[in-house]
């Protein structure tokens, strides 16, 4: 019985996830908080309280808290805290945010180990991906 050689090329892909584009006005910068999955809960509470204290200086009536992906649960938990404990009016908006991922296609794994090809020289491709998100508006 003859052994078959594996003749297909193995190409590996490395995905680099990029954050969403943030187009905010000067007023929105001072009234918007972005929550990541790694943001500590208590730090986010303190930051929101600080923004709520200075929201009148910015001429706004609410603070927007934005979270997407894994941070949706933490963002909603922050909203529940301000609604239940602080008796603030909360509005919740769901969103779908499109982000771009950079996919780097590498040739055969054996060839790449030996060659000194830099990351800039490899074939890159951008792929669009939709991520779910939530926006909380906490009113003063």
From Swiss-Prot:
The lineage of its organism: Eukaryota, Fungi, Dikarya, Ascomycota, Saccharomycotina. Signal peptide: none annotated. The modification Phosphoserine is found at residue 115. Component of ribonuclease P, a protein complex that generates mature tRNA molecules by cleaving their 5'-ends. Also a component of RNase MRP, which cleaves pre-rRNA sequences. This is Ribonucleases P/MRP protein subunit POP7. It is found in: Nucleus. Belongs to the histone-like Alba family. GO terms for biological process: intronic box C/D snoRNA processing; maturation of 5.8S rRNA; nuclear-transcribed mRNA catabolic process, RNase MRP-dependent; rRNA processing; tRNA 5'-leader removal; tRNA processing. Pfam families: Rpp20. Its EC number is 3.1.26.5. It comes from Saccharomyces cerevisiae (strain ATCC 204508 / S288c) (Baker's yeast). Its main location: nucleus. Keywords: Hydrolase, Nucleus, Phosphoprotein, rRNA processing, tRNA processing. The keyword rRNA processing applies.
